[in-house]
């Protein structure tokens, strides 16, 4: 009995360690980067309070909160194993993949999960789920590996707004306005490229070319500012209040550049900033639902 009990305890401990690693791999600080757009999309697509919480919207939010992040960052860590060995960011707030066999299995499972809830969604949402999975894989995995191709690494990261587009389409059964898609895509391009600034030196040492390594820190800030200004313009064409809110991003990157703030510090501010901006966007959509 003692032997069996010990084996069971060891198995439970191992399972706990594996789940803990997968949670760390999924970047909890960034969970709302995928799940947040779902809330925004639902808030602006709903025609009534009853459309806000449905099996479809709950399934989308739950998937993009954790499993989608395991899928996205798991693929990234698997194919960046050698590069990450030299990246100091991995030793601090993230985890280094060391070849654990359960990680590819977990990534595959998370990629397949949308098959379970796709029947709950309008068919208008399906292409955006497929786009997320394809772009998420192609960004890190060969032979495409967008992350090593300047500009394409930035453009492909529009994948971060596909959850919101899918949510809008799932609720409204139509696609969101093209200006909203363009504004969101441009925001994601700027956000991705800004987040690559702390990796400039490790990527250069590893021989990886990205938009950030080609431009260098100063011009990368300018690129991000241009993306975010264009995003604000697109949203402003829909509603001036949306455009005004999105101006916070070019203002922030300009302040960081002028004040010479260390990007390693500024990088970790953005999850909180994005959460606040996303909450304001969502509240605006909910106000529309409640008050017309």
Predicted regions and their residues:
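Multi-pass alpha-helical membrane architecture of UbiA-family
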Residues: 1-292
């Amino acid at each position: 009995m003692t032997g069996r009990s010990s084996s069971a305890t060891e198995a439970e401990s191992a399972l706990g360690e594996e789940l803990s690693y997968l949670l760390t791999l999924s970047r909890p600080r960034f969970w709302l980067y995928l799940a947040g757009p779902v809330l925004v999309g639902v808030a602006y697509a709903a025609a009534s309070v009853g459309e806000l919480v449905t099996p479809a919207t709950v399934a989308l939010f739950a998937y993009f909160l954790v499993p989608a992040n395991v899928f996205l960052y798991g693929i990234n860590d698997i194919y960046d194993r050698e590069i990450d060995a030299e990246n100091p960011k991995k030793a601090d707030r993230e985890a280094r993949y060391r070849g654990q066999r359960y990680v590819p299995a977990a990534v595959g499972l998370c990629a397949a999960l949308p098959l379970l809830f796709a029947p709950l969604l309008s068919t208008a949402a399906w292409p955006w789920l497929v786009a997320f999975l394809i772009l998420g894989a192609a960004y890190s995995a060969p032979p495409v590996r967008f992350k090593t191709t300047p500009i394409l690494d930035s453009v492909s990261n529009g994948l971060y707004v596909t959850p919101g587009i899918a949510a809008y389409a799932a609720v409204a059964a139509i696609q969101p306005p093209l200006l909203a898609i363009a504004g969101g895509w441009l925001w994601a391009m700027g956000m991705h490229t800004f987040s690559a600034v702390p990796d400039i030196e490790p990527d250069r040492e590893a021989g990886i070319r990205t938009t950030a390594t080609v431009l260098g820190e100063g011009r990368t800030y300018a690129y991000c500012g241009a993306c975010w200004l264009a995003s604000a313009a697109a949203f402003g064409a829909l509603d001036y209040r949306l455009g005004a809110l999105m101006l916070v991003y070019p203002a922030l990157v300009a302040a960081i550049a002028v004040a010479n703030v260390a990007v390693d510090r500024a990088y970790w501010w953005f999850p909180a900033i994005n959460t606040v901006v996303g909450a304001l966007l969502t509240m605006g959509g909910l106000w529309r639902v409640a008050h017309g």
